[in-house]
């Protein structure tokens, strides 16, 4: 009987894998046909203005249209996740070469067409921002291996002195702070057992509002905390790279948004779910003693954060540029050399797919710019919404990205849309920083659905939070985020 049930389970899994593969193949074929159809239509109608020097140049028109068709294909693949989004990222340089996309260059007074070389198409995968993020993963690995993340969390929660309100806010605060430096997913997963330990002392039925407040507080604080630093969330790095922002420059933008959204989130959750904080609770503590390695880890963390924040001043002192990536790689080298984490630890805790996704997004950006596809797309969008007031455009873009990432990967959305909206901003005479930062920050502000972010899925998986709870609170927070992100960035750069 047992053997039969195991066989049935294996067959069910196999059928599921086959149906998933079939779905992926069908979507790839449909995406290819739709993209090719767009290419044919654009070649026949040419519904956009062409620079005077390219009028009558059919090769230029075909090159632009190939770039736009590639953009559509990648968009369908990333949003549908027909294959893993990392694989789609790796497709981008391959497709650019196969499709014969290139750029026009002037040589000896004459204009000639040059096909993309594979080395050019792959250059995005060696971008310094990728290594900055890798250093962030190495730092997070060291904190996790030495249990310093948990030690900090337990210490702050223990300060509540049995006060449920203070403990609840403390859990959310720790989640937010750790998420500035550690993966949002890892932070939420680590904080969940601490929260469940507190909630186990309450009545699940009578204190349901308290359950939902604390659990959603953890999920949302993890997402909000990721806004504070470049390494907090992948979309931050994508936007920062487009704007050539360093670690400190990003913090000047991301940190205020984080500090505004955090209290608004807790207030919103309190008003909606009306938790009962009158209970006295017992805080379970775990003895994590200070060791030489833990002290060294704290020192490495503090020095790395200091170097990131004060990179410009350090550059002036040392006489060479202290780049974010240089600091990150130095931290990774030190971490392994002094033995506070092994290479295996770092490799296991690094999300390599995110790093490749970065590279694919940067490759796509280069292809769109060099083929003039992004310029043409910007003109077309500008013609449609060019008469709208700037503040309306800003709020519409904020709403678009925030609700879009309820259904799609925030990193993939940012990788696709940041280069596009950078060009659209120029065509609309809007400072590029406004739309790029709205895409970069807004991509992390998805609060409404369990599938929107890993932290949402983690707390939903406990069974204590219903989807209607998340939708109710998330809708309000999405609207708040649209206003906060849109208005703050607009006021900063308009």
Question: What kind of region is each of these model predictions?
Answer:
Residues 73-80, 141-159, 201-203, 272-276, ...:
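C-terminal ends of transmembrane helices
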Residues 13-18, 157-162, 207, 217, ...:
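Membrane-interface segments at loop-to-transmembrane junctions
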């Amino acid at each position: 009987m047992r053997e039969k049930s195991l066989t049935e389970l294996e067959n069910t899994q196999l059928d599921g894998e086959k149906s998933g593969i079939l779905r992926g193949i069908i979507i790839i074929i449909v995406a290819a046909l739709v993209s090719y159809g767009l290419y044919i239509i654009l070649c026949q109608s040419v519904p956009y203005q062409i620079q005077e020097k390219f009028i009558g140049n059919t090769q230029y028109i075909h090159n632009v249209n190939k770039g736009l068709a590639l953009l559509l294909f990648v968009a369908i693949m990333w949003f549908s996740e027909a294959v893993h989004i990392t694989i789609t990222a790796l497709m981008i340089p391959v497709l650019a070469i196969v499709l014969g996309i290139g750029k026009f260059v002037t040589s000896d007074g004459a204009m000639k067409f040059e096909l993309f070389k594979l080395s050019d198409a792959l250059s995005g995968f060696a971008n310094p921002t990728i290594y900055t993020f890798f250093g962030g993963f190495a730092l997070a690995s060291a904190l996790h291996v030495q249990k310093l993340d948990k030690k900090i969390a337990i210490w702050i929660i223990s300060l509540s002195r049995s006060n449920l309100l203070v403990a609840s806010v403390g859990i959310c605060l720790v989640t937010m702070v750790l998420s500035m430096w550690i993966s949002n997913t890892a932070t939420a997963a680590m904080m969940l057992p601490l929260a469940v330990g507190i909630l186990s002392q309450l009545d699940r039925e009578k204190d349901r509002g308290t359950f939902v407040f604390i659990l959603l507080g953890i999920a949302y604080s993890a997402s909000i905390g990721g806004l504070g630093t470049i390494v907090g969330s992948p979309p931050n790095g994508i936007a920062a790279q487009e704007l050539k922002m360093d670690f400190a420059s990003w913090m000047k933008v991301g940190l205020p948004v984080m500090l505004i959204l955090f209290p608004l989130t807790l207030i919103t959750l309190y008003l909606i779910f009306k938790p009962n904080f009158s209970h006295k609770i017992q805080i379970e503590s775990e003895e994590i003693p200070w060791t030489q390695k833990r002290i060294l880890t704290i020192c490495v963390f503090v020095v790395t954060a200091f170097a990131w924040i004060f990179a410009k001043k350090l550059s002036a002192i040392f006489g060479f540029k202290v780049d974010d990536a240089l600091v990150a790689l130095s931290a990774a080298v030190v971490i392994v050399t002094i033995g506070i984490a092994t290479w295996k630890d770092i490799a296991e805790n690094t999300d390599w797919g995110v790093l490749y996704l970065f590279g694919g997004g940067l490759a796509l950006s280069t292809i769109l710019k060099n083929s003039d596809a992004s310029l043409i797309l910007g003109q077309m969008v500008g013609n449609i919404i060019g008469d709208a007031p700037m503040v309306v455009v800003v709020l519409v873009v904020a709403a678009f990205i925030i609700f879009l990432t309820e259904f799609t990967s925030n990193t993939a959305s940012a990788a696709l849309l940041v280069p596009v909206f950078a060009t659209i901003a120029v065509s609309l005479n809007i400072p590029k920083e406004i739309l790029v930062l709205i895409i970069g920050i807004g991509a992390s502000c998805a609060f409404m659905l369990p599938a929107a972010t890993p932290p949402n899925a983690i707390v939903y998986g406990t069974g204590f939070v219903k989807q209607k709870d998340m939708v109710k609170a998330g809708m309000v927070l999405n609207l708040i985020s649209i206003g906060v992100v849109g208005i703050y960035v607009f006021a900063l750069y308009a």
